[in-house]
Amino acid sequence: MRWVDRHGGLLKTPATEAQTLAVLQRPHIASKLPPAYLAGVRGLFSRAELVPIVTPVVACRDPTDDKFLELAVNGAADMIVTGDLDLLVLHPFRGIPIIDPAAFVRGVGPAGEPETR
């Protein structure tokens, strides 16, 4: 969460916010997260930039994930961070890197690729 504060904002649409929060509350995921995690994510979303969707995107093998691609394209995102394999297989999507959360936590370089240390 500090990375977002230092390096730029988080983008959202009402649909991406709702789906992200719903996924994090699934029992098999919520049981692995610290109690304050969901509150922290909600705090991030409260400061996120709301992006209007002007250009629809239909590209993902799971159509429910197209909303995240639409957000990235319409918001000119620097990257997409996800653990969803249906999105990860599209890396990069229209020049936007798609990385998993572990790569994001390790830190990313200016081009959106994991830094080498």
What is each residue range found by the language model?
Residues 1-27:
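PIN/NYN-family metal-dependent endoribonuclease catalytic core
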Residues 2, 71, 90:
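Hydrophobic/aromatic ligand-binding patch that stacks against planar heteroaromatic rings
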Residues 14-15, 83-85:
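Short secondary-structure boundary segments
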Residues 29-33:
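Membrane interface segments of multi-pass transport proteins and intramembrane proteases
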Residues 46-81:
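Mid-chain, well-packed structural core segment of small domains
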Residues 58, 62, 75, 79, ...:
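Acidic, PIN/NYN-like endoribonuclease modules and their adjacent C-terminal/linker elements
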